[in-house]
Amino acid sequence: MDISPAEISGILKSQIENFGVEAEVSDVGQVLSVGDGIARVYGLDSVQAGELVEFNGGIKGMALNLEKDNVGVVIFGEDRSIKEGDTVKRTSEIVAAPVGKALLGRVVNALGEPIDGKGPLKDVAARSQVDVKAPGIIPRKSVHEPMMTGIKAIDGMIPVGRGQRELIIGDRQTGKTAICIDTILNQKPTNDAAKSDKDKLFCVYVAIGQKRSTVAQVVKVLEERGALDYTIVVSATASESAPLQYLAPFTGCTMGEWFRDNGMHALIIYDDLSKQAVAYRQMSLLLRRPPGREAYPGDVFYLHSRLLERAAKLNDDNGNGSLTALPVIETQANDVSAYIPTNVISITDGQIFLETDLFNSGIRPAVNVGLSVSRVGSAAQTKAMKKVAGSMKGELAQYREMAAFAKFGSDLDAATQRLLNRGARLTELLKQPQYSPLLMEEQVVIIYAGTRGYLDKVALKDVTRYEKELLVHMRGAKKELLAKLREKKELTSEIEDEIKKALDDFTSKFA
């Protein structure tokens, strides 16, 4: 092939013009020391706080301490393969997680990567930063719609509304997780009947520092009962590093916020935040931040407040969505005045206090009605529930007070005897087995029977049987009445007359 000298310069010019500088410029540093999930890195002068960095072998970490001569990085995963002198690379990304409906029915880790063996996530809507600012005051609206848990004691006396933060607090083995799982299961009938996604309630369950077997059991229950279809499970188990246990609640919250910001409703459960605080304490002490009370760092209050403030009910201009939070805190020997419990009690809009003594005496769910409170109150109840359950909390409080005195005296007047009689039956009526949440209209009928004296003549040992048989009767012969109550959501005089008639008929036949 002959090329004339005149063409040579033209060919060289075109080659030079097409020459690309493919070299990648990245900001790198070196590992000075590593241990206990923390790496000290030299270099990375322009790294941001909370930025994701990458070690050799693809292990990720987050820059938390920005000091004069080094950067403290917490490592997401095993630190065994990281050695002194290794290169660390900036990614210029703040820690983010995948969001959207593609995550429903999946189990993911604290970084949003699937760990359920069902393959990679498909059609992820976006990736969102995990630690963002909570909505301000103007975009919010006061809580006014009920978020039904399906548990009579809670929906009747300590109602939770959409957009509320209600703390579940108690010692180990008092049924805290059981309440959370029942709440998720209770959304199934509503979600199945929903015409659009805006009528559904999507759930996010964040397991922090729990045993793998416990998380597997929860997932199994949700799957068997068809509740995993509208639930995302985020898991950072006890065997995972402290940074991942610290991060998991933020990742879960971001996934829940996507529903809230797109005009839908979501519920997030943090099980439990005590373990997140312990993980954060471990990280902070290893990063040599000064310890405060109980050796927790000074900003442990801010850790939980910025997380829980992201649960909100948005107003009409912002799509009307909501994110409801049920944080769980484990106490030691019922000590509610420890540092983390008092912090979270002061951040949330009420607490459900579970007691070992009640649990052991067979009152389950073991809710202490005296210490539990919802600061939203009856605004988060349907009109029907407000009407039938309004007096119940007061009656039970009076009953407990009287029961304490009744131990001393045997000759009680008729009114006191009536009060004790009614209180004992209400306490019995509020017991509920696990995995059997009730619909709002069923609860209204049962509580109506209790507070309006239909049980006063029923023997105490027969109360549970009365309730079971009443439910069968209502779901069978009276299902139109339940449907009417579900639709109207209030106790009109016509519906009340029908309930009275149904209860009169049933009670007269009950034996």
Curated annotation (Swiss-Prot):
Function description: Produces ATP from ADP in the presence of a proton gradient across the membrane. The alpha chain is a regulatory subunit.
Subunit structure, as described in the record: F-type ATPases have 2 components, CF(1) - the catalytic core - and CF(0) - the membrane proton channel. CF(1) has five subunits: alpha(3), beta(3), gamma(1), delta(1), epsilon(1). CF(0) has three main subunits: a(1), b(2) and c(9-12). The alpha and beta chains form an alternating ring which encloses part of the gamma chain. CF(1) is attached to CF(0) by a central stalk formed by the gamma and epsilon chains, while a peripheral stalk is formed by the delta and b chains.
GO annotations of cellular component type: plasma membrane; proton-transporting ATP synthase complex
Record InterPro entries: ATP_synth_asu-like_sf (IPR023366), ATP_synth_asu_C (IPR000793), ATP_synth_asu_C_sf (IPR038376), ATP_synth_F1_a_nt-bd_dom (IPR033732), ATP_synth_F1_asu (IPR005294), ATPase_a/bsu_AS (IPR020003), ATPase_F1/V1/A1_a/bsu_N (IPR004100), ATPase_F1/V1/A1_a/bsu_N_sf (IPR036121)
Name the record gives this protein: ATP synthase subunit alpha
Annotated positions binding ATP: 170-177
Family the entry assigns: Belongs to the ATPase alpha/beta chains family.
CDD domains noted in UniProt: ATP-synt_F1_alpha_C, ATP-synt_F1_alpha_N, F1-ATPase_alpha_CD
GO molecular function, one term: ATP binding
Lineage of the species this protein comes from: Bacteria, Pseudomonadati, Pseudomonadota, Alphaproteobacteria, Hyphomonadales
Organism: Hyphomonas neptunium (strain ATCC 15444)
Keyword vocabulary terms for this entry: ATP synthesis, ATP-binding, Cell inner membrane, Cell membrane, CF(1), Hydrogen ion transport, Ion transport, Membrane, Nucleotide-binding, Translocase, Transport
Membrane topology type: Peripheral membrane protein
Residue numbers marked as site, Required for activity: 372
Compartment(s): Cell inner membrane
Top-rank EC class of the record's enzyme: translocase
Coiled-coil region list: none
EC number(s) stated in the UniProt entry for this protein: 7.1.2.2
Catalysed reactions listed for this entry: ATP + H2O + 4 H(+)(in) = ADP + phosphate + 5 H(+)(out)
Pfam families: ATP-synt_ab, ATP-synt_ab_C, ATP-synt_ab_N
Keyword Transport belongs to the record: yes
Signal peptide: none
Main location as per UniProt: membrane
